[in-house]
Amino acid sequence: MRTEVLCQWVDTINPVISPSQWESCKVEGLRLNPESDTWLAIDLSPDRKQAALVASQKLEGDKFQVILLQTWHNPSNLDDKALANDLAEWVRKYPVQLVAYSARTASAVAARLAPAGIRTEPIDGLDYAQSCDELLGAISSQRLAHSGQDELTKQCLSAVKLPFGDGGWVMGRKVSNAVICGAVASAMATHYATKANDGVDIVIV
């Protein structure tokens, strides 16, 4: 990926997603099914000025879709109560199984959802690293489908790999030097959309 800086294009160091692979996953006219199981994921930027909400649903076969539902911006600081209220409105529109979030960035929002009966689940550490791997694998194999939303594309292609542990990696919020809340939320939503219904992906006969 290349980024424009001072009217010059420079390569993004160690990008997570290849623009050509992302483009190959684009499917025109994708829409969420109001009757299908839905997983939501929310992520906030480290400075708490940006946030994004992403939904995922399974499609036919082993494919699934991710859709950017909403973004937030506040030049000072986001209001966790306002975000929780907005998110609750989306929960009412679809059969949401749970809302995934990072305890590092969105714990205040999640804490407001639980009393309303909305199931939440944190994804951090090894689980977050796994979700990043799952996102990249789904993109490279074209199991992931997206509608080509400009903002989601921008954020996903801005994500940079950050080494994690011995041989692992994650999408680094700070090292990306850009807003990647949508990319992080996509990874978390992917984690649930890629799970097999019976818990088994491979059957040996």
Task: Give the label of every model feature segment.
Residues 1-42:
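ATPase catalytic-site recognition across NTP-hydrolyzing enzymes
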Residues 7-9, 44-48, 57, 103-105, ...:
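Short, flexible loop/turn elements at secondary-structure junctions
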Residues 12-15, 47-51, 61-63, 75-76, ...:
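Flexible loop/turn segments at secondary-structure boundaries
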Residues 31, 55-101:
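Nucleic-acid-processing active sites and adjacent nucleic-acid-binding tracks
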Residues 32-58:
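Gly/Thr-rich phosphate-binding beta-strand-loop-beta motif of the actin/hexokinase/Hsp70
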Residues 37-39, 50-52, 63-65, 96-99, ...:
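Beta-sheet entry/capping signal
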Residues 66, 93, 112-199, 205:
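Metal-dependent DNA phosphodiester-chemistry modules and their immediately adjacent helices/loops
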Residues 94-110, 121:
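Short glycine-rich phosphate-binding loop at a beta-alpha junction
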